[in-house]
Amino acid sequence: MVKTILSQVKEYKRVSILTPVCMLGEVIMEMIIPLLMASIIDKGVSAGDIHHIKVTGLIMLLMAAISLTLGILSARFGAQASAGLAKNLRQAMFEKVQTFSFSNLDKFSTSSLITRLTTDVTNVQNAYMMILRMCTRAPATMLIAMVLSFAINGRLASVYLGAVVVLGLLLFLIMSKAMRYFKEVFQKYDDLNASVQENISGIRVVKAYVREPFETSKFHKAAQNIYDRFLSAEKILSWNMPLMNFTVYASILLISWLGANFIVAGSLTTGELMNLLTYCMSILMSLMMLSMIFVMVSMSTASAQRICEVLDEQPDLTNPEHPVFDIPDGSVEFRHVDFAYRKDAEKPVLRDIDLKVTSVETIGIIGGTGSAKTSLVNLISRLYDVTAGQVLVGGRDVREYDLETLRNEVSVVLQKNVLFSGTILENLRWGDEHATLAECQRACRLACADEFIEKMPDGYNTYIEQGGTNVSGGQRQRLCIARALLKKPKVLILDDSTSAVDTATDAKIRRAFAQEIPDTTKFIIAQRISSVQDADRILVMDEGQISGFGTHEELLQTNAIYQEVYESQTNGGGDFDEGGEG
């Protein structure tokens, strides 16, 4: 874990080294100053030597200035190093997520990834800053002060050496108990973020069903869980200060009493006693500082582990050692394919799929919810890998192709239509960043999106809000289809992508496809048989298996499921189940 985190320091190694170096210099200056102060008292004030007081005082001022400068530099370098580490961690995690397959992403919830990219990275950033500065300052202060104290008077120094040992053990017990609650806190942050994300993204549904009180209650519960665990940890940590104060005051009283006796006996000077008291405070405060460092590091350890889970996750889908960069045509073949989302699944989602589609064919796919329609087409663009068998595109196993090449040639319009913040033109150019305005207009004409775009005041420069909330569901679908067409793919997959448009527009889109992109192999998943009945062939899916495959007329004669649904839809009745992932 430590190696993974530190590997992201990269260009900030120099400032990461300079931070503790400057801090060590500051501590050395601070530890020498009490010795000079003792000299002023014993050799200057007591002896009435004004010259000694002036010279030593100037040296003290110089050392204080050096200490201050080194402290400022240490803080500056530490801020650069910790902020740089946080930046690199966020970039590394985000870039790693971009390489994940769908199966990798299934292991992390959206809210969990957001927490890791924000709260967890901030915790590690703060801990790194503290480690660079305070983890240098506290041990160095304790060590130097202890050595100097024993050099002055070993018997008095042993008093707070014993106090340090006792206090250290007590603080360790406190920190160990508090750590358990901090680990739980960060797990509960995921629940809080999930509640916020779901509520904001689904606010229209919440209001439509008057579920504001329920959602508010759910959020309050998540917030209360975090509060309760933080409070439990803080109750334990609240013992830190009383124990610290008791130890400090007890040590000062004991050292003062013993020191006074030593002064009377002539074995200790007043300046040396002041030094000992100063070093006593420095040692005990350093111990308190270490206890706070322990808390911060303990909290950040939980965050660091969660960050490393993302960075150490290996993508399930990778390019072959010698990838193929050319796909000759849009033919697609499934050879006895089995597929499951998890390796430990009791039964596969797809079972023994054997299917051959020639280039330029239009294939309709229908089936009820859970029949694995989407799972089937996801294998063509290698969003997932098969569990058994082979999927071939252009006569080659999809695992032989360069992933970017494959996905550029197999364009998918997913069930969930997603648009991004930006203009319509910017969204369209996700399909081809170099597409001209004329090419974008042609794609929109094929998708019947030009009809509403031209009515907008700003046309193709109309700004799309986050998630496409300022356009209708049907308009989002048509823009997503146009975006996919700009890739000029050899294979086009429409996953129930016209469900929100009216039947007339649906028919216009299908006619445009037939006339304008006849050389593209098309897979059209639909709930309405009218959307696929003109396809070259229609695939009927049922519980992860092929129930029927043929033309509309053939299926009406041979497939009971197809017959039943066709008759029902023709008579204005039922439909395949809608809304689920097929």
List PLM regions with ranges.
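Hydrophobic alpha-helical transmembrane bundles that constitute the permease/transmembrane domains
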Residues: 20, 24-32, 65-72, 124-127, ...
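Membrane-integrated ABC transporters
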Residues: 1-33, 37, 45-59, 73-78, ...
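An intracellular "coupling" helix at the cytosolic face of ABC transporter transmembrane type-1 domains
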Residues: 11-14, 99-103, 119-132, 136, ...
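Transmembrane helices of ABC transporter permease
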Residues: 11, 15-28, 60-63, 69, ...
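Juxtamembrane helix-loop junctions of ABC transporter transmembrane domains
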Residues: 21-22, 29-42, 63-110, 114, ...
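Helix-loop-helix
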Residues: 49-53, 144, 148-163, 232-306, ...
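ABC-type nucleotide-binding domain
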Residues: 325-582
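Short intracellular "coupling" helices and adjacent cytoplasmic loop segments at the cytosolic face
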Residues: 47-48, 83, 91-115, 119-121, ...
